[in-house]
Amino acid sequence: MVENISLNVTVKSSARKNQQQSPALSVKKRAQKSQDFDFQFNVDKPKVKAIVVRRRAPPSKVEPTNSSVPNTTKSPTPSVSSSKSAISTLSASPKANASNDDLMFNVSPTKPPVKSVLGDDFMLNVTTKPVVAQKAKPKITRAERLGKKQRQGKPLTKLSEEQITRALKSNKKPKNPNQLPTPGDLFRAQLEEERRQKRREEGGGDQEASADEEDAKNNSGGGSPRVKPSSAVKESKKSSDIEDSGESGEESATSDEEPDESSAQSPGQEKEPKQTAKKPPKAEETSSTNRFRTKKIGLFDQSDVEALKQLGQRAVKPVKETIFTGSKISTLGLHPHAVKNLEDLLSIRELTSVQQKTIPEVLQGKDVLVRSQTGSGKTLAYALPLVELLQKQQPRIQRKDGVLALVIVPTRELVMQTYELIQKLVKPYTWIVPGSLLGGESRKSEKARLRKGINILIGTPGRLVDHLLHTASFKLTKLQFLILDEADRLLELGYERDVKQLVEAIDKQRAECEDKELPQLQRMLLSATLTSQVQQLAGLTLKNPLYIDNSDEAASAALKSKDGYQKETIEALLEVDDGLGEYQEDVTGVLSIPENLQLSYVVVPPKLRLVALSSLLAKEVDASPKQFKAIVFMSTTEMVNFHHDMLNEALTRRVLDEEDEQEKGDSDDDGDIPLLQGLRFFKLHGSMTQTERQGVFRGFRDCASCVLLATDVVGRGIDVPDIKLVVQYTPPQTTADFVHRVGRTARAGRKGRAVLFLTPSEAQFVRHLEKKRIRIQQGDMYAYLQTLLPKDDEARTVQEAASNLQHKFQTLLEDDRELHDKSCKAFVSWMKFYSTFPKELKPIFNVRIAHMGHFAKSFALKEAPSKFAAKHAAPKAAPPTNRLTYTERDPEKIQAQKRAKRRFTTTVSGEVRQLQQRDVGAQKPGAPPPKGGFIGGGVGRSSFMKSLGKSRALNMSEFDSGLPPEGAAKRRKQA
């Protein structure tokens, strides 16, 4: 028979819009609630918890109960398809199904399905799996996230200023590669300590307690936060924006003009009654309550954060050279006078390593090629055996023998230094005459000395070639010694042509000499770096030389395998490929630094370079005020001129000219103490006259506390005692230049320091030095800037002191038009220098990456470079030419030119008189003589020609004297 089936479904009606909706359950609560059976019937996503199907009696329309169903056998389980169709029917139209009499819905509280004890025919239970809560993603730190991106090769996101500030304020500091606190941490701690100290001095204990309470209140979230020292970065950023819009250089308002920060309230906080307090006097107010008296010039911004980065130091094994060996001079077998002279005049009793290796070989007459580090005594290594061999010759040499030893050096200062050393060495031997020839001196006096005779001649290549072509008494026939000192610098300065011409002239004169018993010519070449061009020069000048390397390890072990060089013998070295002909680095890879030299570099933002240099010098002067010598290397002549004038006027107030002397009394800063009081600045570069260069060089050696601003003209061979610091304000273009620059200090076993200035974009130059086995440490810029704070009464922080000093530089530049022009020229010359780095360093020193506006600020300029660069970028005028630049170098053609010029000389010679008589004879009879009275114009009877008849010679200076013309010459009485 057909039985009616009753389906009891428990549903949960959906909430309507007008009804109040129940709050949504969390994932965790929903997971707990899924243990009970619930039927949620939503239109969007129905969730079936339980379906119970029961059989009931057919005729009655009463609500079925469990008792009306007889307890029979187990009901058969319906098919899955029938259950699915029932569910789909219910979900499609639940209201239609509810109106059916056969199916009735009992909405009751949720209960778990229980099997009927009365025995139902069948029962269908459909359940769903409980909802499992999703696991939250594990949180990772920012460093792990960036590291994961870096491993996957994804681009790193750029941090905002708020993120950087939050990272700096957080307690989790990144680990330093050197396991040392970062400069930024030390700087912030120092600023916090200074703030507390200032507050303690100004307000006493009560104010300090109230300030601490306010700090605690701010930390808990009430009120506005107090201004912290780290906010100076944001203040300076705002000032940089003001400066870019053309309003830089203006002073910021004092604290009375600023709004009271403690009065600011949070949005939900009630406004407290304003407390009135007694105002201090005006003088007290300006001294104690002025919080930010900073000239807003925009020095500290995002680049300052970049400068705080620690680059770290790699493990580098430097090339070591032993300077002193412990052997005495008496062991060389020299003349007793020479040994005593060295002890008395030079205080030298012990030999250096290069001297011990070189002097015995030179005494045996061998050609040598010497490579040794700067300051190891190379000059004495060839000068001492040179004098010893000359004084041994019998019969004694005489002055009239001429030049027996020729020493070629690259610079005039090195000529003076070498000449003074040889003068001391030949003091016991009065018959040996040394002399020097260098550019800038009078040729006439040099010709006279050459005619008298010079036995040991020291000179620069240009002046030596000049006398070789134009001085008949300069003969090199009897030359016995040819020495080339600082050979690599000779080639860098463009003297290769002159050196080659000198060597060819020596060989030609010796070949043409009739005396067949000429002494053998001994040749020596010395350098601190062995470049490929030095090898080529050695091939031209040396004959079977002996290579002497002073490094502790063999130079062949340091050769680069990829270049294919094997330097087992000097012959293989000279037959090297021309592949590195223009490569100026040391091909042996041996770049040795003295062990007592402490190398460091400082990463300085471009806008802080001038201030950082001033603070560095101030710190060193404070450490040793009575005895301090330093050399600051710069790239161009214009930079040296500008920084010399700027630092003198701004930091020492030294009178430079008459106008400064007149304005000295009108200055408003007479009460202030200069930052570098007592320090003297010198400048030295190649464009100065010889008289100026000699005076500067001697003044720098004799001065106790001074700084020399110079180009690379003093980078080679200059030996000035007691130089404590070398600053490379602009980076060198080659590693060899770096080695020679830092070699001006820590000479002959003394101690010294060298500091290299780099910008954040140039920091990878350190890795380039480390590849060359040069160990260098990173210095702290803020350690130098802190020196400015005690010397600035208006500044409260280091940033304020640095900004005030920069403002002082800019104000001085605005008031002095001449100094402003020098600054513009210096900046343009620096731009040209920066674009000429070699190919291998172009990625590090890239002119396209450099921010020219920031670099212009290091020259105290406020204008954009585009406004003045075109004006000062015009090509320079041609330098004054000498006889080597515009005359013929062939001696025969030179003599022909001299004979042609005699016709136009002011000396009254026979040719001139014949020319005058011919011109007078060619004049028409009766015609008046032309005005002017010039030679060759047919004016034989003019006053000028009559004056020539009385004088045998006239100098051109007599015509340019500016004196009034003399009266007409008196006529002679006729007999």
Swiss-Prot record:
This protein's record includes keyword Protein biosynthesis: no
Compositional bias (Polar residues): 1-24
Pfam families xrefs: CTE_SPB4, DEAD, Helicase_C
InterPro entries for the chain: DEAD/DEAH_box_helicase_dom, Helicase_ATP-bd, Helicase_C-like, P-loop_NTPase, RNA-helicase_DEAD-box_CS, SPB4-like_CTE
Molecular functions (GO terms): ATP binding; ATP hydrolysis activity; RNA binding; RNA helicase activity
Residues annotated with Phosphoserine modification: 75, 99, 210, 220, 224, 667
GO biological process: ribosome biogenesis
Sequence motif: DEAD box, positions: 485-488
Highest taxon above the source species: Eukaryota
Gene Ontology, cellular component aspect: nucleus
Keywords: ATP-binding, Helicase, Hydrolase, Nucleotide-binding, Phosphoprotein, RNA-binding
Acidic residues compositional bias, start-end: 242-261
Catalyses which reaction(s): ATP + H2O = ADP + phosphate + H(+)
Gene3D superfamilies linked to this entry: P-loop containing nucleotide triphosphate hydrolases
Domain called Helicase C-terminal: residue spans: 616-789
Domain Helicase ATP-binding: 359-548
Biased segments, Basic and acidic residues type: 190-203, 269-285
Entry similarity comment: Belongs to the DEAD box helicase family. DDX31/DBP7 subfamily.
Protein function: Probable ATP-dependent RNA helicase.
Name assigned to this protein: Probable ATP-dependent RNA helicase CG8611
Organism: Drosophila melanogaster
